[in-house]
Amino acid sequence: MFPIDFCHIPVSIIKRSAGRSAVAAAAYRSGTKLTNEWDGMIHDYTRKGGIVHAEIMLPAHAPPEFADRSILWNSVEQIEKARDRQLAREIEAALPRELSGEQQLALVRAYAVSYTHLRAHETRSN
């Protein structure tokens, strides 16, 4: 394995009270155009460069239609109706340059599975 001299992984919460939108964040991170059905705003980041990979990973029990980014994040926006709701968590990570693109992707996927599994257990008080 490669030595990692520095690990920086900030986690932030996307919440309406801070003027943020899960749909807007998803559009920005994926470099796509999405319309937020909650407030009617169109978020177009199709000209944004630097998107190496965008993927939605769903648990086995999730409805298959949530593989569509617009359906997934608009569903979150619709379910969480109050202005003070936390809509999503955003995790940024500096990946080791020594790893290939495939290795970086595998690392991120493993982290996502591990993180969501841990969060599910915290939520259920297990």
Predicted regions and their residues:
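N-terminal nicking endonuclease/strand-transfer module with a His-rich metal-binding environment
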Residues: 1-125
